[in-house]
């Protein structure tokens, strides 16, 4: 484990963690039903989505299904730093490859962000869905967020985007859920839950499954194993891989 991964953990137990739903409805079932109704009524192409490349493959897969139904413009936020070309990679997102393979992020991650900002400015984008990012740091200002009819955000800690949101859905840290990532070498690796979510927070894949069903009518698996296996059947890069096959070492796929 790198030093950043070993030492950067205290935020998980931060006193500022988002632990309750913010919005007109504050119970999960009612909030998701309300959001689903809003999305069903949204004209095609009037919704955009920014989903972090720190989300799991399973979460990104469900978000992609939602985006396809809504004809939503999507992207992820590139996150780069210093690399040593040996052990430390310059890409600081743990799942950039997953976001690209699943289709949330374009090949040039971040290239759709200016288009989303312009769409909000022009009024063609009226609803924005954000998972795990503070978009005010990547060209979508708080003023632009104020122009939206609906801003739906899921995150772990408060930021300027959660402050502007009409709905905030509290998500989980990696240690509080299960899922998988695709690393820089193309190895699909799974991780396991070792602590309970804070307050009323839920694993994103769990409530996304409910939301996708409410919006699209497409039911799916309610276990992480079944969800991964369903994704592997639909996303070409993952075909032939199963959750069980990942084991402790993972499985390498073609990038």
Q: Model-predicted segments: where are they?
A:
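Catalytic P-loop NTP-binding/switch module of NTPases
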Residues: 1-41, 45-51
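Non-catalytic alpha/beta scaffold blocks inside enzyme catalytic domains
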Residues: 16, 26, 30-32, 41-42, ...
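Short, acidic Gly/Pro/Ser/Thr-rich loop/turn segments
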Residues: 9, 56-57
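Acidic, Ser/Thr-rich low-complexity intrinsically disordered segments
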Residues: 241-255
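Conserved short loop/turn motifs at secondary-structure junctions
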Residues: 48-56, 133-136
